[in-house]
Amino acid sequence: MKQMILASASPRRRELLQGLGVPFEVMSSDIEEKINTELSAPEIAKELAYQKAKDVSNKLDGDYIVIGADTIVEYNRILGKPKDADEAYQMLKLLSGKIHRVITGFAVIDCRTKKEIVDFEVTNVYFNHLSDEEINRYIETKEPMDKAGAYGIQGKASLFVSKIEGDYFNVVGLPIFKLGVVLRNHFDINLL
C-alpha cells in the first residue's frame, strides 16, 4: 500500500484514521486559511482542503497519497473556529435550537501520478435549545475553542445534539465512508 500522509494537525482526524488501523503519517500544512466569501460553503471547504493537500504534496517526492480536509459549520453564514470565548458564545447561541450544516471538504492527491480528487460531505445537525448557563459552562471547558462552529460533537457538546442526518464522522472532521469510496474507486486503496 502507498504511504498515506494526513495533511492536518487535527487530533480528531488523526484519531479517525487510527481507528481504521491504517498506517499513515501526519504532516501539517503551512497554508493560511483564507475564506473566499464568493464561494458556496461546500466550495470553500473543498478549496481549503485542496490547498492543504497540495501544500503538503508539493513537499514530498515518492509514492505517497496525501489527504487534506477542512470542516466548516454553516447556519446563515460560515462559522469557523471562534477567536475567543465571546465569539464561541455567539456561535453557540446562534446554533441553539436550530438545524445547521456541517460540511467537510477533502482532497486526495497521489504524489507519483499527480491524480487529484476533491469532494465533500454534508451532515445536518439538530441542536437542542441551549440555556446561557449551558453555553457558558461549555465554554469554560475550553473544548469549543479549536473547533468549527465552537463545538465538538464527540465531546461534551454531544449533550446538545438531538439528532443528525448524514455521516457522524463528517461532523467530527473526516467523512470516513466517502473518503473510503474515493480511495477505493480512484486510487485502488482499500481501507479494510
UniProtKB/Swiss-Prot annotation:
One of its GO terms (biological process) is nucleotide metabolic process. Its EC number is 3.6.1.9. It is found in: Cytoplasm. The active site is at D70 (proton acceptor). It catalyses: dTTP + H2O = dTMP + diphosphate + H(+); UTP + H2O = UMP + diphosphate + H(+). The record marks R12, T71, Q154 as: Important for substrate specificity. InterPro entries: ITPase-like_fam (IPR029001), Maf-like (IPR003697). It is an enzyme of class 3 (hydrolase). GO terms for molecular function: dTTP diphosphatase activity; UTP diphosphatase activity. Keywords: Cytoplasm, Hydrolase, Nucleotide metabolism. One of its GO terms (cellular component) is cytoplasm. Gene3D superfamilies: 3.90.950.10. Nucleoside triphosphate pyrophosphatase that hydrolyzes dTTP and UTP. May have a dual role in cell division arrest and in preventing the incorporation of modified nucleotides into cellular nucleic acids. The lineage of its organism: Bacteria, Bacillati, Bacillota, Clostridia, Peptostreptococcales. Belongs to the Maf family. YhdE subfamily. SUPFAM superfamilies: ITPase-like. Pfam families: Maf. The keyword Hydrolase applies. Its cofactor is a divalent metal cation. This is dTTP/UTP pyrophosphatase.
